[in-house]
């Protein structure tokens, strides 16, 4: 059976793993890196994903897209998105209330939904796994922050579909990390484990009870879907923009390229400060020819981000109170996510737990993908001893309910309820002879629906006339294992029934949208492939030219007539000039040039080789000059 993979789709980096031969393999990409930047770049000639996209970001800041996870499943007017737009060099536009990313690609203006950008990253992860496994991959488990709401989960699932994946399950990142921890450590007995997951863009805290290393039960979860390493980078960037303004009276914030180079340097400095107490920033010709050399101490960095670091403790307190536990009942504190390497974050957490030592034994960058790979193996029926007894019980991160008279939020499913779960309540009409009811579904913790998030609504009509309070309307909430909600309403007297899967219609892609994006993704993939083939043909032609020119200086070349020598030299120079002037040519054009060059030069080179070898030799015009030839046909001759 083809392997199912686990993908950690991160804000800044993504990671993919597969469970085989009794263990998880985290798969390195084509650059040899076990994590891949969640970046997609568009240029005049091509689309780049991952390391290649991040490496060229300073040259092409406005068309290099990242942070799609901070956009996915949100509305354009979300205050978080409005704040982020100040930091992003790419353009985000409002498309009927949804954020879309606008870029220039191959000379045209294009807009992409966040799901499409995420799907491109997922495609890269899928291809990374396929290259390693040597077979095509269809099934995947994708992780999301535990605190992602319904629409963010749906949108992530859609991104998987656009990438051509069958998303077997959406699982929570801290839960996946707990799986990695529990299986890696062979835990005995019952242990309460707190997962503290601070990544590039999101923050989660989950408390689980792990029993005998096989039953993983989430007791509570809390977090902030908009807090992570990028926010720390932003603080450092703002600090240096001010310093530059003070020192040189110039404003970096108006220059996208300079800002991007500064951000890259800040990200590097932040990492340095996790192991050193001081970091140096050196950027040549940052703006208007000014070389910018400066330093930042760990203490200064901690002061710049102090409120953000402290804010990580609130979700810890909330999770403890929801799980009805005190600090002393936590056995293990497990750190996940690259930002947990920051010493101040560690010391704040350790002090909160009265000096209890933190568990640093799992790889914070890979733990989530590891757990996702295990869950993928479980769901695809892998009977390996290590995982066959594993049972994962997760919870709903937010309360779910409907609006009742006066705008009150009436909850059917409380937050931190086990999933999957189903709850039914009976409601009635508010007025005499009311012909129908409007069911409005919300998620959130506030008492009034206006303060919570509307997920969707539908009408149940055809209720027989009756005094208020008499009709019995049965509303059922069914929350599946992905944390996605189905709602049904039934009038008990007439038997009329209506149900919806909450699709958050204002925010969710329709099936038609998804189908269109799937075919576009296929088109982009084919274009990428054509681009690769054209580059290969160009390189082959160029190499052939240089090999020919080298042969003119090689041994035996003095036996060539001046006319022949000039012919080869001129044709090579002419071809190289053509290559320089036609960098966007198709593969066929390069191949045609190759054939023309070979037609003129091969006979001359054959002559050269025969003379060099002191007489006629069996040769093949297709194999001259370092193995590059344009002609097809036999490449050997019979020798008498």
UniProtKB/Swiss-Prot annotation:
SUPFAM superfamilies per the UniProt record, alphabetical: Actin-like ATPase domain (SSF53067), Heat shock protein 70kD (HSP70), C-terminal subdomain (SSF100934), Heat shock protein 70kD (HSP70), peptide-binding domain (SSF100920)
Gene3D superfamilies reported for this sequence: 1.20.1270.10, 3.30.30.30, 3.30.420.40, Actin, Chain A, domain 4, Substrate Binding Domain Of DNAk, Chain A, domain 1
Alphabetic keyword roster: ATP-binding, Nucleotide-binding, Stress response
MF (Gene Ontology): ATP binding; ATP-dependent protein folding chaperone
The keyword Nucleotide-binding is annotated on this UniProt entry: yes
Domain of life: Eukaryota
Pfam families documented for this protein: HSP70
Family, similarity comment: Belongs to the heat shock protein 70 family.
Name listed for the protein in its UniProt record: Heat shock protein 70 A2
Gene: HSP70A2
